[in-house]
Amino acid sequence: MNPSRYRKRLRLAAIVLALVAGCGSSNPLGGGSASGDLKSIVVGSADFPESKIIAEIYAQALEANGFNVGRQFGIGSRETYVPAVRDHSIDLVPEYTGNLLQYFDPKTTVTTPDAVELALARALPGDLSILTPSPANDTDTVAVTEATARKWNLKTIGDLAAHSAEVKFGAPSEFQTRTEGLPGLKAKYGLDIKPDNFVSISDGGGPATVRALTDGTVTAADIFSTSPAIPQNKLVVLEDPKNNFLAANVVPLVSSQKKSD
């Protein structure tokens, strides 16, 4: 593909998705039409419900603005779909600013949304770019049931660390090795989850994770902060005063062709 046309297409996509970001929870699908001769753009997603929903919002918004959109949803974890963006198997995928920053810069110390966005833009390799982040901050959390919080008098993640030997922790398998996952929780709070007490659940804090938490299969779980399951099930989100989980605004990650004369 001609690099200049590719960059032009991504710039047009950026305009559309910036409008989506600005819409918040309102309907982003109304609007005009982009140039009718645009080639296809492929939208991907991670393999959990929220990522698929956001990717579909992106896809429909782009279609409403004249793009021919291909969909490759449920690709897998960040370790799988980031390389797919880089090799142009997909053109864009919904991401989270803080998580993506920790993926490229595990030693980052920034925590606020603006600082995270700036640091992420600097940390990305040259063939990747981010578009306009949404105002929505949907960070990871450590959640427990109300009964567990009451039993152990839990307020913070540090409080849970005192019961490490008794905690069964539910999260996607990659949470065992990611900076913000078990390594970060151990380093910052002393929460030491042994391998036998980690329960791999692949739905990214979705229904299977919530069910495992509420039926006692796990004691604590990684659940996104905006999940409606938190109030619906009276789950308790433990405070994270040491900012293990960074601000995580939803943002489109796109491939950007290397500049070519």
Question: Positions of the model-derived regions?
Answer:
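Bacterial N-terminal signal peptides that target proteins for export
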Residues: 2-13
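C-terminal motif of bacterial Sec signal peptides marking the signal peptidase cleavage site
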Residues: 18-22
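Bacterial signal peptide processing site
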Residues: 24-27
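Bilobed "Venus flytrap"/periplasmic-binding protein-like clamshell domains
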Residues: 38-70, 75, 135-209, 215
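Beta->alpha turn/N-cap motifs
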Residues: 77-78, 88-100, 115-117, 145, ...
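Ligand-binding "clamshell"
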Residues: 104-131, 217, 228-242
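Short Pro/Gly-enriched coil loops immediately N-terminal to beta-strands
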Residues: 113, 132-141, 240-249
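A bilobed periplasmic-binding-protein/Venus flytrap-type ligand-binding module shared by bacterial periplasmic
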Residues: 140-150, 248-260
